[in-house]
């Protein structure tokens, strides 16, 4: 790897880390934000819906915004969001989560599009960085709050300073990325005489021409999106639906007794509260994500639907454990959660590697940003379903004389 390639890899690793670490910390803090009585999917919903909305809308407007302007927007929204999350008021917390979510979704689209300019080395760095965000965010939150007993508010405020690392974007060697991207302007008009390229900046035209241009731009964008649905979006959505149902709806109920004679001798020493179990699951999940996103390019899986099927099997196993209490030791569940994260990370990196390999170069930048809608949509569906699934599992456990899901 040349010095230039190494530098690009490191920068995109850092961008992936910072863009995702706040998302991870917020999900790790879900049990501290809403407590044991409210479903953790409430935090997931606030953490994913704004991100999904910005991703759904971005193909229609993002080409007008310079990358430098996007970076400053990311820093502002992320810092403000984490500052608000540190408040104890639930409404203010959820508002802060929404700001951080918008930043995360907008950042993912932005940096995935930037990989179009810096090729696979940048995607490898980005994917590894997003995986690193998981393990660093999850593990640091676990160590700070569960082992070192740092107050949750102070921990969240410390994380609010991290987005300033996005300023390293301005250290990237110029590759015309300060301009708005031009892929929408590269449509071959010979293929469709009626297509009118959407302008990067508005010019003085009459209202009817502008309206016609906008309508044609929207129709063309929808046409380009439709082609990406089944090869990339459906399997990625399915994987994320299954894994986030596990993480935010089932995992909070995968508990074991930590007090008295019922406590297993094999229980980790730092399991003092039931929230410690949940936070540990999150860390193990993120460890699996980190490993697969870092080395997924070495273990290529081009059939994305296989990964979706395997993740569905994991969901079934965890629901059975929650309902029937099959194993009384946490270690088997902890290994399964790690494996679940590994599959999720593998699905993510292989999806975008497939795009780089299979899509036309003129369409790659658009496809990279557009397909990022899929993972957020899967998480959004999981959040909605989880609002009902976690309470149902918890009620069954209480009736089965396992009231741990309502205990701190």
Curated annotation (Swiss-Prot):
Cellular-component GO terms for this entry: fungal-type vacuole; vacuolar membrane; vacuole
Q: Which InterPro entries match?
A: Battenin_disease_Cln3 (IPR003492), Battenin_disease_Cln3_subgr (IPR018460), MFS_trans_sf (IPR036259)
TM ranges are: 42-62, 80-100, 128-148, 150-170, 238-258, 323-343, 369-389
Short name of one Pfam family: CLN3
Gene Ontology BP terms: L-arginine transmembrane transport; lysine transport; regulation of intracellular pH
Changing residue 181 to F has the effect of:
In strain: K289-3A
- Which UniProt keyword terms apply here? Amino-acid transport, Membrane, Signal, Transmembrane, Transmembrane helix, Transport, Vacuole
Residues making up the signal peptide according to the UniProt record: 1-30
Where does the record place it? Vacuole membrane
Q: How does it sit in the membrane?
A: Multi-pass membrane protein
The superkingdom of the source organism is Eukaryota
What happens upon changing residue 328 to R?
In strain: K289-3A
What does this chain do?
A: Plays a role in vacuolar arginine transport. Involved in pH homeostasis. May be involved in ion homeostasis together with IST2. Not necessary for mitochondrial function or ATP synthase degradation.
Protein family per UniProt: Belongs to the battenin family.
Entry protein name: Protein BTN1
């Amino acid at each position: 790897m040349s010095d230039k390639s190494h530098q690009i890899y490191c920068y995109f690793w850092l961008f992936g880390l910072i863009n995702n670490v706040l998302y991870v910390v917020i999900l790790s803090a879900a049990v501290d934000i809403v407590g044991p009585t409210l479903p953790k999917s409430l935090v997931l919903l606030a953490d994913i819906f704004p991100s999904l909305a910005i991703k759904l809308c971005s193909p229609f407007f993002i080409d007008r915004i310079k990358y430098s302007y996007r970076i400053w927007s990311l820093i502002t929204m992320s810092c403000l969001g984490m500052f608000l999350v540190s408040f104890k008021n639930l409404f203010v917390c959820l508002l802060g989560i929404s700001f951080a979510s918008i930043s995360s979704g907008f950042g993912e689209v932005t940096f995935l599009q930037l990989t179009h300019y810096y090729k696979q080395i940048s995607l490898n760095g980005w994917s590894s960085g997003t995986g690193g965000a998981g393990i660093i965010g999850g593990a640091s939150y676990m160590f700070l709050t569960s082992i070192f007993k740092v107050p949750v508010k102070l921990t969240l405020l410390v994380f609010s300073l991290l987005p300033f690392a996005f300023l390293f974007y301005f250290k990237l060697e110029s590759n015309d990325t300060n301009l708005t991207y031009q892929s929408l302007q590269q449509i071959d008009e010979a293929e469709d005489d009626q297509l009118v390229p959407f302008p990067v900046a508005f010019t003085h035209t009459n209202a009817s021409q502008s309206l016609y241009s906008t309508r044609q731009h929207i129709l063309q964008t929808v046409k380009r999106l439709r082609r990406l649905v089944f090869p990339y979006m459906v399997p990625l959505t399915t994987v994320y639906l299954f894994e986030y149902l596990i993480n935010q709806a089932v995992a909070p109920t995968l508990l074991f007794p930590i007090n008295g004679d019922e406590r297993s001798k094999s229980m980790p020493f730092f399991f003092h509260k039931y929230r410690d179990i949940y936070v540990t699951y999150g860390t193990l999940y993120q460890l699996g994500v980190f490993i697969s996103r870092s080395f997924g390019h070495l273990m290529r899986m081009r059939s994305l639907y296989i990964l979706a099927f395997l993740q569905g099997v994991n969901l079934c196993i965890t629901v059975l454990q929650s309902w029937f209490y099959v194993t009384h030791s946490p270690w088997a569940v902890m290994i399964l959660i790690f494996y679940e994260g590994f599959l999720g990370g593998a699905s993510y990196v292989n999806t975008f590697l497939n795009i780089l390999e299979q899509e036309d170069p003129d369409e790659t930048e658009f496809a990279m940003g557009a397909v990022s809608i899929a993972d957020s949509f899967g998480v959004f569906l999981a959040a909605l379903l989880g609002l009902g699934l976690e309470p149902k599992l918890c009620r069954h456990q209480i009736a089965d004389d396992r009231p741990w899901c309502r205990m701190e």
